[in-house]
């Protein structure tokens, strides 16, 4: 977006807000969120004895509008690395532009709620379409979302174009789309919050051999002090055959104390077998990494965005503790292997401290130590994050 277009956007928004304040019946509510984060640089280019740090800031201002059965939500966002060259900090020049992270409206139709525009779309807590809040930008989709409440739970149907290829192919079959259905069912006979999820997604790529369907299910349930979180998903097409599996067993004491909960987990992501014609690597193209696989971005198992990777076989042990001064402490131990189990990547320990300073302001500090299996070095990652919400 050019500076001229940016000013035009702000002028239009200002005019719109003035109209809101001069008597229209539309109800509205403002919100704001600013997140500052300092983190260490884990690039292999950082030389021995050198220290490299990065300062990130993400600012969001939101406007929620309600007029009868119709509502709209706009979230304007600015994401930057402080001091980046294109910020022109301290220089009399234009800077990077803000953008709409979300901009959508809702309206009812019969028993459904229709949502159209640009929006976040995390499907529960599953691993295929996860909330990507760690990223300094975040992930938004564009398209149509249909929601419906049913006696047994909730159903979501979505159609999301991700790449429009008209400038190259002028052929709808060459566009990239993500279409799917997600069903959530509450398990009322078990602990509060217990749910079962079923989902089916179809990913249409401009290259037909990279198109595939994903079918999966996830359960999060508890019986008194015992908890289970498990997920299984299958990706299939003429050229792709991959799967993902996860089993996590937890214990939560009946009486609140120093230990909030303990989890023992196993995660599996299939890797590609180079001796076959098919691609067996499971793609988490829209998934999250830090949420499940530790905080250190070790290059050999950092992302699983395609089908050509080695996969992952991970064992982990996690404790959530009520630490000093009403601080929550997450302690996590990870043991990483390739999907076939033949290659040992390394071990990781995470210490994540979270504290609500007071209403609207929270502080988070994390330490991650990674020991690669192929040498005796200890790699480290440190971050400090302050979040303010209004």
Regions found by a protein language model. Give the residues of each.
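Internal metal/ion-chelating core segments
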Residues: 148, 153-226, 230
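Acidic, His- and aromatic-enriched active-site or binding-groove loops in soluble protein domains
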Residues: 136-144
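C-terminal outer-membrane beta-barrel translocator/porin domains of Gram-negative envelope proteins
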Residues: 240-244, 254, 261-311
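Conserved radical SAM core fold
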Residues: 36-41, 121-128, 164
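Beta-barrel outer-membrane channel/assembly domains of diderm bacteria
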Residues: 22-118, 144-150, 155, 210-213, ...
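Active-site loop-helix segments enriched in His/Asp/Glu that coordinate
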Residues: 131-134
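Cleavable N-terminal export/targeting peptides
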Residues: 1-27
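Outer-membrane beta-barrel and related beta-rich outer-membrane complex signature
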Residues: 44-46, 86-88, 128, 169, ...
